[in-house]
C-alpha cells in the first residue's frame, strides 16, 4: 500500500524538518512495516516547465520542428521535436541534460544530453507524458502528442515537480503487517498512528449528514450470520473529469485516475 505524505498531512501536522527515514523506522517498530520511502520529485530531476516562444521548420526533416523554448534561465533554447500538437505559447515539460526519460514511453531509461538531430543542435527534449512516467495522469489522445501544460499557470523554469504538485514523499507499507488492522487501510488510519507516536493533534473527520430520504430498504434474511448491513443509495451522479488535485493523489498512490 502506498501513502502520500501530503495527504496524511491533511489530518496531522507533521513537522517540516521531520526525518522521513526516522518516521518510517518508528512506524515499523510500533505499528506497520514501512518497506520504502520515495521522494517523488526525484523522478523529475532536471525537468522544468518551458514556454514555446517560436516554432521553425527543421531544414533536414519534414516531421521535425525546431522550437525556441524559454526555460527560465534567461536564454532561449533550441529544441528539436516531432510532436504533432506543438503551438507557439504552449507550456511544455522540458527534460534538460541529466534528466532520465524513456523514448516514446518504451525501453530502458536514457539520460538526456545535448545533441544534434538531423544536423540541428538540440538542448534537451520536449516530452510526451508517457516519456516521463505521467502517461496515466495525463493520457495522450493520439500518437506523438506532447504533454500540454498550458492549464498550469506557472513561470517558465518552474520545476516540473513543483508545477504539478509532485513534490511529495511516498511511504510504501507491507499489507501483511496490518492484515488484522483494517483501521489502518488508508491515510487517516496511518495519520492517527503518527499523531499517537509523536503526541500530535489529529484532525477530526466530520461524518457526512444529509436530510435526503430514501425508500431503499434492506432485509436481513439471516441475522445470525449477518447481524448488520449498511447500504447507501446514490442518485444524481454525473460522470465527469475529477479535479486535478484528486487525480494527482490517486496517481501518487499507484492507481489510475479517471
Locate each region found by the language model.
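Phosphate-backbone binding interfaces of nucleic-acid-interacting proteins
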Residues: 1-208
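Glycine/proline-enriched, intrinsically flexible loops and inter-domain linkers
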Residues: 4, 12, 25, 39, ...
Amino acid at each position: 500500500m502506498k501513502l502520500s505524505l501530503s495527504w496524511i498531512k491533511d489530518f496531522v501536522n507533521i513537522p517540516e524538518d521531520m526525518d522521513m527515514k526516522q518516521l518510517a523506522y518508528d512506524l515499523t517498530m510500533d505499528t506497520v512495516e514501512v518497506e520504502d520511502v520515495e521522494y517523488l520529485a526525484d523522478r523529475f530531476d532536471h525537468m522544468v516547465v518551458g514556454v514555446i516562444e517560436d516554432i521553425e521548420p527543421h531544414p533536414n526533416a519534414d516531421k521535425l520542428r525546431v522550437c525556441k523554448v524559454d526555460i527560465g534561465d534567461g536564454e532561449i533554447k533550441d529544441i528539436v521535436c516531432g510532436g504533432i500538437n506543438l503551438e507557439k505559447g504552449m507550456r511544455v515539460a522540458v527534460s534538460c541534460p541529466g534528466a532520465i526519460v524513456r523514448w516514446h514511453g518504451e525501453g530502458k531509461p536514457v539520460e538526456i544530453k545535448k545533441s544534434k538531430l538531423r544536423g540541428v543542435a538540440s538542448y534537451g527534449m520536449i516530452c510526451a507524458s508517457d516519456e516521463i512516467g505521467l502517461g496515466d495522469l495525463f493520457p495522450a489522445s493520439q500518437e506523438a502528442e506532447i504533454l500540454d501544460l498550458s492549464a498550469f499557470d506557472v513561470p517558465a523554469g518552474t520545476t516540473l515537480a513543483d508545477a504539478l504538485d509532485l513534490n511529495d514523499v511516498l511511504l510504501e507499507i507491507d499489507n501483511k503487517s496490518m492484515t488484522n488492522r483494517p483501521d489502518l487501510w488508508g491515510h487517516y488510519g496511518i495519520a492517527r498512528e503518527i499523531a499517537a507516536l509523536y503526541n500530535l493533534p489529529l484532525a477530526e473527520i466530520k461524518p457526512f449528514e444529509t436530510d435526503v430520504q430514501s425508500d431503499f430498504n434492506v432485509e436481513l434474511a439471516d441475522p445470525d450470520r449477518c447481524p448488520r448491513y449498511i447500504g447507501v443509495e446514490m442518485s444524481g451522479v454525473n460522470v465527469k473529469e475529477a479535479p486535478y488535485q484528486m487525480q494527482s493523489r490517486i496517481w501518487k498512490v499507484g492507481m489510475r485516475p479517471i
